[in-house]
Amino acid sequence: MLLAAPGSASAAASPSPSATPVTYKIGIGQDYDGMNPFSSWSGISWESFRLGYDFLTWYDEDYQPAPDLATSWETSPDARTWTFHLRPGMKWHDGQPLTARDVAFTYNLILDTQTPAYIQYLTGVTGVTAPDDVTVVITTRKPNAGMLALYIPILPEHVWKKVDPDHLDTFKNMPFVGSGPFRVTELKKSKWVKLEGNPDYPADLGGPPAIQALYYVISQNTDSMIEDYKAGNLDAIVDFPATYEKVLAAAPGTTAVAAPAIGFHELAFNCWSSPKSKGDPLLRDAAIRRAVHWAIDKEKIDATSMAGQAVPGTSLLSPAEGAWHWDVPAADQYRYDPEKAKQLLEDAGYTDRDGDGVRENAGGDKLEFRLAALNEYPEDLAAAKMIVSWCRDIGIKLNLDQKDEGAFGDEVYDNADYDLFIWSWGGDIDPGFMLSTFTTRQILNWGDSQYSNPEYDRLYVRQAEALDPSDPGDTSKRKAITDEMQKILYRDDPYIVLWYNVNLQAFRTDTWRGYDQVPAGNGAPFWNYMRGTYTGLRPVSAAATKPGGLPAWLPVAAIAGVAAAIVAVVLVRRRPRAVEDA
C-alpha cells in the first residue's frame, strides 16, 4: 500500500505521558506564508498541506496514480464518468467523520468560485456528487486525462462552509483541521512551523507517525544553520546552496544527496499587454526576450552558482518528469552567442542612438529594465549578477533589485509590478498544472509571466481532454500536444529556464532510520511528493529523542523541552494573497 511504514507505528507513537516527545527538526532557509491552501505558495506551507490533508488519489514511488482517500475507482466506457470508492472510517483531526460529502464539497467549492488556485485541475468537469458516504462520482464534458492527478487537498465541509466564498484566500485556517498523518499546531513567523503526529492515522496509509512533533526551523543564515546541524541540533537541512554539499557529506553520521527534482529556476519576463501592467511594455517584444536568451551562458551559471550540480534548462517540463519533458533538438537550442543576440536586436530596430551603451527603439525608449532576485536564494543572486553583465554586453541595461520573497510575491501576483525576475517552481508530477500557468486565465493568478497566447490556450484544453477511453494508460496523444505547447513557450520566451531543480538535502542516519529516498537509492527523502519518510522515520535509540542544543538563531524560551530533529526541502512556489500570518 501507499505510504507503508516499517515496524510497529502504534507502539512507537504512544509513549507514556511523561516521556519526552519524539521530535524531529528540519532546517530550511525559506519562511512560510500562511496555511491557507487557496492562497499559500511557499515550500513549507505546501509540504505541510501534503502532510496535513489527504487527497482523492496520490502517487506510488514510481509516480504512478495510487490510492489515498480513494482505494479504487472505475470509469464509464466513454471515460466521462469516474466513480471513486473511499476508505471507510476516516476522520478529521477534530474527530469528525470524513465522508464523500467532504470530497464533493471541496470540488464543488472550486467549481462554483472558479478559484484560480485549483480550477485548472477540474477542466471540463460538469458535476461532482456523493451518492453515499464512501462514493464520489465525477462527470466530465469530455474525457479528462488528469483525473487521477487532482492535486487538490480535501477540505472539511464543517469548517470551510462557514467561510465566505468571496474571501477564501484570506481565511487564516488556524486551528488547522485536516485528515493527514500530521496536523499543523503552531506557527511562529520567521522561526518555525510545528506539526504534531496524528495518532488515529490509518495503518494501511502508514499508521500513526513515530514522530510526535515535527518542526520546520526557519533560518536566513546558511552558515549558522549548517553549524547547528553539525552540532546535532538539527536532524536534517534542505535546499542549501550547492557549494555546501561536500561539506555536509563529510559530516559524521550524515547522508547528503543532490537529487534531480521536478521544477526549475527561471528568468521570467512581464509579458502582460494590459494597461494595468506595471511592467515595461518593451518586453512584450519577443525579439528582446530571445536576444536575452542567446546572451546567457547557462553552462557557466551551473558551474558557478550551482557548483556543477544542476542541469542547464531548456524546455519547461524538467527531465525528472520523464516522458513529459520535451527534448529540444540540438539544432533548435539556444546557445551562448552574444553576437547573435546583438544581431537580433539590430534587426528589430534597437540600436544605441546616443552612444551610452544602452540600445533604444525608434522612439528613444531605452532597453533598461528592473531585474529582481531574492535574498533567500544566493544561487539566484549569483545568476542575476552574471545575467546583468551579459546583457550589458549586448546593449541592455538591467538594474538588479534584491528583494525579500514575501513582499516580492505580492508585487508579482497581485500587482504585476516587475520587469524581469529570477525565481523557481516546484511543479507537479502531472504536467497539467505547470502548463496551465501560461494560459490567459492565469494572468494575475499562477501566471507570473502574465503571458497570453490563444493558440496555447486551445492546446491546453486539448491536452486535458486527450484520453483514449479504450486505453486510458496511453499518453501518446497527450504527449504530442504537451510537446507542442513547450515548443511555443521555447519560441516565445516568457520564461528562460536557467537550470532544473536539484534536491540538496542532508540528514542524520546515525540517529534515525526509515528514510524513504525517491527514486530508490539515490533520491531525496523529503520534498519528493511522498509521505514515506515522515511516517516511516524511527529513532535508532533513545538518544535521538532527547532534548539537544538549540539552533543558534532560535530564542531558548520558544523551544524549551523540544527534542532535536528535522526534515528536508525542495521549494514549491504557490500563488500568494493577502493572508495574515499567525
Where on the chain are the PLM-derived regions?
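Alpha-helical secondary-structure segments
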Residues: 25, 99-106, 133-139, 180-181, ...
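N-terminal lobe/hinge region of extracytoplasmic solute-binding protein
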Residues: 27-77, 108, 177
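A structural "hinge/loop" feature
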Residues: 29-49, 69-71, 96, 118, ...
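Gly/Pro-rich hinge or "lid" segments in bacterial periplasmic/extracellular proteins
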Residues: 60-64, 153-208, 213-215, 223, ...
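Surface-exposed binding/hinge segments that line
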Residues: 85, 119-162, 186-188, 304
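Extracellular/periplasmic solute-recognition and catalytic clefts
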Residues: 110, 127-129, 185-196, 215-276, ...
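Ligand-site clamp/hinge motif
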Residues: 170-173, 200-247, 383, 388, ...
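Detector for C-terminal structural segments
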Residues: 188, 192, 197, 260-265, ...
